[in-house]
Amino acid sequence: MLQTAKFSLRALKHSIPHLGNCMQKQSYRNVAGPYYSRVRLKKYHLTKCLQNKPRIAGLARNIPSRSFSCKDLLPIKPESEKPISENMDAFEKVRTRLETQPQEEYEVVNAEIKHGGFVYYQEGCCLVRSKDEEADSDNYEVLFNLEELKLDQPFIDCIRVAPDEKYVAAKIRTEDSETSTLVVVKLSDQPVMEASFPNVSSFEWVKDEEDEDVLFYTFQRNLRCHDVYRATFGDNKRNERFYTEKDPSYFVFLYLTKDSRFLTLNIMNKTTSEVWLIDGLSPWDPPVLIQKRIHGMLYYVEHRDDELYILTNVGEPTEFKLMRTAADAPAIMNWDLFFTMKRNTKVVDLDMFKDHCVLFLKHSNLLYVNVIGLADDSVRSLKLPPWACGFIMDTNSDPKNCPFQLCSPIRPPKYYTYKFAEGKLFEETGHEDPITKTSRVLRIEAKSKDGKLVPMTVFHKTDSEDLQRKPLLVHVYGAYGMDLKMNFRPEKRVLVDDGWILAYCHVRGGGELGLQWHADGRLTKKLNGLADLVACIKTLHSQGFSQPSLTTLSAFSAGGVLVGALCNSKPELLRAVTLEAPFLDVLNTMLDTTLPLTLEELEEWGNPSSDEKHKNYIKRYCPCQNIKPQHYPSVHITAYENDERVPLKGIVNYTEKLKEAVAEHTKGAGEGYQPPNIILDIQPGGNHVIEDSHKKITTQMKFLYEELGLDSTDAFEALKKYLKF
């Protein structure tokens, strides 16, 4: 996915809690005129992080009942068991190399911005620029040394160049924190830092009537963005508050339309939005309200040729539709319906060109691109290859072409370009990935308890025999209207090559089938997502994909709610579970209004403090509230000490309760009963949006292989090749 957000619908994801690694990292984009964005892989060392110590006493310790923490990476085995199998040697070799060698991210971390004849990017620990034709050489100009901020392993998250190239602004953060510092550098023969602002989320440049650069930015406090500031530099330096949102359940986000004509001030929560237009040519004029907030109404705005294009769910059906109106008549009564989506359609992104509007869609779990001719309102719908599971958006200022990439969990991104003049989609030529012949992707459905058909995406080797005897790794999320993360991951490729079946369950609460799909899995319909997950796993087994003793389940963040609920209600369906930064204590979290995100989360989980119905409903599925003495699958939890979004206290509380339940059940289970491993791995440092480290990947893979009693030698040797040792 991306590397840049083309539309505020996508850019919004930076501010929604619990997203983190549910999606690929994105950079905000500025493509006015000659802008475009590229990315580089970011190199870093893991050794510093490994030397850190947890700052919360008592958390990094062995938890009885055969478990370990970050200090003990191997589970405790009773003396009666066999020694650790020889296949662990491969894992240990990989882990040793990981701890001593520089690593490359597979996720995008740093954005590049082209403005005029220069490309701005990060090189080493510096913000630099080089001439466009020399962008891939070592001939660059250093603009700012990030080490001046005295941060631990800082990197540039986003870059914006002022319209006349007098200034460049860069948002800088570290792997261990979501807090960002915005640095403004004055461009000259001797570049100097003009100003710095702490705790910045989104930011954009505009130019006023006197050609003065004006910077707008949002200030983040305790993960909440409620304040917008406006700043100028040079002789007329000033920094003033422009807007403050009073409702704590909303947040603010800035988005510059693609043509830079308007800066949009977006005020929103999970279900409702309000947009104000700031004139990109007269930023000192009062902003213009498009439509005041109405509960349940979402809308996002683009601009082209004095017309506003509005993506909104207003009207029936309550799915997204595209409307337009004159820029000088933005009120809702002037909106005209322009394009309607089909049922079961998710709008992934929108991009506006001179003569075309391009919609990136997911319909019935398959990817499409719709190209709308703005001169004649013609629509060309292109069904994309069935192997594709996700888009990676490329910002582009060329009005003649629309480039993008397609990817899947087991296939690296591949470039495609739609050329408007030819009216055709062109595929990148070159070496064909062998995975296309050695694996299969299937789209199947499971019938949930209420009859609703739930889509699944399944991957397995083409030549696999007797799939019922193959290991299965199931993935689920089901919250916030977000899709399952299905970008390319080398470890997923390795698993399929090693005979595993991968299944992605697109349950209600997620967004794969549109807004209603999300609505049917939130608040007092959360149990629909659990019923969907149960139906998916049972359907996989009934159709010959693996069996319970070889079935594992993986989830991140809010996906932990459904996984934890499944472990409590249907533990017999699983053998092992891996959870990362999981949300497990829903009730106590939502009761604690002192937590920074509780008020923003009310639209997703409900308000147990004031609504007894919500409270009782949460009690029915909350993982932490429903633990009981019974057999559980083995559980590996990765938590981060500095996670600001999912409190570590809730994860530890869940682990302790689960440990006690397992111990009580084991006492009465009889001789020979094999209790599960309950593993809590607390990573020093880190935060909710921490990047995927190779150490974490190999640790989790080792856990799955060990729990299923499989030989991991070939898998880890293959993984070493992908990690480029």
From Swiss-Prot:
Tissue occurrence: Highly expressed in the brain, specifically in neurons of the neocortex, substantia nigra, locus coeruleus, and cerebellum, and a slightly lesser extent in neurons in the hypothalamus and hippocampus (at protein level). Also expressed in interneurons in the stratum lacunosum moleculare and stratum radiatum.
Keyword hit for Ligase: no
Gene Ontology CC annotations of this record: cytoskeleton; cytosol; Golgi apparatus; nucleus
Active site: 557, 643, 688
Domain of life: Eukaryota
Localization, UniProt: Cytoplasm, Cytosol; Golgi apparatus, trans-Golgi network; Cytoplasm, Cytoskeleton; Golgi apparatus
Disruption phenotype: PREPL-null mice are significantly shorter and lighter than their wild-type littermates and suffer from neonatal hypotonia.
Keywords carried by this UniProt record: Cytoplasm, Cytoskeleton, Golgi apparatus, Hydrolase, Nucleus, Phosphoprotein, Protease, Serine protease
EC number in record: 3.4.21.-
Phosphoserine carried by residues: 137
Family according to the record: Belongs to the peptidase S9A family.
Function description: Serine peptidase whose precise substrate specificity remains unclear. Does not cleave peptides after a arginine or lysine residue. Regulates trans-Golgi network morphology and sorting by regulating the membrane binding of the AP-1 complex. May play a role in the regulation of synaptic vesicle exocytosis.
Cross-referenced PANTHER family: PROLYL ENDOPEPTIDASE-LIKE (PTHR11757:SF19), PROTEASE FAMILY S9A OLIGOPEPTIDASE (PTHR11757)
Quaternary structure annotation from Swiss-Prot or TrEMBL: Homodimer. Interacts with the AP-1 complex.
Name used for this protein in its record: Prolyl endopeptidase-like
